[in-house]
């Protein structure tokens, strides 16, 4: 269990779903049961590892960051790969991994059209990496990267597997599927939000402000 106390375990919880998603892309599309089973097992492993962190965490010092790690990343702007958890982020991390397990269990038998478990489950696991990363990131640029990772699979999941109901939307000449409209709206709003975040980070770097979230 020593690996879980020096930041390695936390990194595994974050990146294991991403590695699993990559492996899923290598599995032939026709082997749906293998894809579903592999995705479920991967999510369960991630959940178990996050649950183990509950026993490694010192709740008497819940206000302090623990089980983290810091590695120099982009030296020119003093950005680091810095992660850690406290009494607030740990429950959210465990909840994130648990909900992912439930989502995969449900989607195995209720996968929306078009039924492509390979793409859907791989996207869901990439989404999990982004979610887990946002809860543990202690560097502003690292947080931004993980936040953007969340947005990419969400956009495709909404646009491909969303509601196919056709509706009339002001501004569109013809009727449009709800999922297409929702994905466009999602893209526009997140694009503006990401632009503002990126601009704010750039200003912090230019003014030589600290981009370490704990300082």
Residue ranges and their predicted role:
Residues 1-2, 20-24, 72-80, 127-141:
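Membrane-embedded alpha-helical segments in integral membrane proteins
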Residues 21, 47-50, 104, 152-156:
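Hydrophobic transmembrane alpha-helices of multi-pass small-molecule transporters
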Residues 1-9, 27-108, 112-122, 211-214:
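Transmembrane helix-loop-helix hairpins at membrane boundaries of multipass inner-membrane proteins
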Residues 12-32:
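N-terminal signal-anchor/start-transfer transmembrane helix
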Residues 16, 20-23, 42-46, 92, ...:
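Hydrophobic residues within membrane-embedded alpha-helical segments of Major Facilitator Superfamily
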Residues 5-16, 87-96, 141-153:
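Structural signature of hydrophobic alpha-helical transmembrane segments
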Residues 30-32, 119, 123-126, 130-215:
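Alpha-helical multi-pass transmembrane bundles of energy-transducing inner-membrane proteins
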């Amino acid at each position: 269990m020593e690996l879980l106390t020096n930041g390695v375990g936390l990194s595994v919880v974050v990146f294991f779903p991403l590695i699993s998603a990559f492996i899923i892309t290598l599995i032939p599309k026709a082997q749906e049961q293998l894809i579903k089973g592999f995705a479920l097992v991967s999510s369960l492993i991630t959940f178990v590892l996050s649950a183990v962190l509950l026993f490694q965490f010192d709740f008497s010092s819940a206000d302090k960051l623990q089980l983290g790690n810091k590695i120099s990343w982009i030296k020119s702007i003093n950005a680091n790969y810095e992660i850690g958890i406290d009494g607030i982020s740990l429950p959210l991390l465990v909840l994130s991994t648990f909900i992912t397990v439930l989502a995969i269990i449900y989607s195995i038998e209720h996968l929306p059209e078009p039924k492509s478990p390979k793409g859907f489950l791989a996207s869901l696991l990439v989404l999990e990496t982004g979610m887990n990363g946002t809860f543990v990131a202690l560097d502003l640029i690292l947080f931004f990267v993980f936040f953007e990772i969340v947005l990419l699979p969400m956009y495709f999941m909404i646009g491909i597997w969303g509601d196919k109901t056709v509706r009339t939307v002001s501004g569109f000449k013809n009727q449009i599927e709800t999922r297409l409209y929702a994905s466009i709206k999602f893209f526009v709003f997140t694009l503006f939000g990401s632009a503002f975040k990126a601009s704010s980070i750039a200003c912090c770097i230019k003014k030589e402000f600290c981009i370490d979230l704990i300082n």
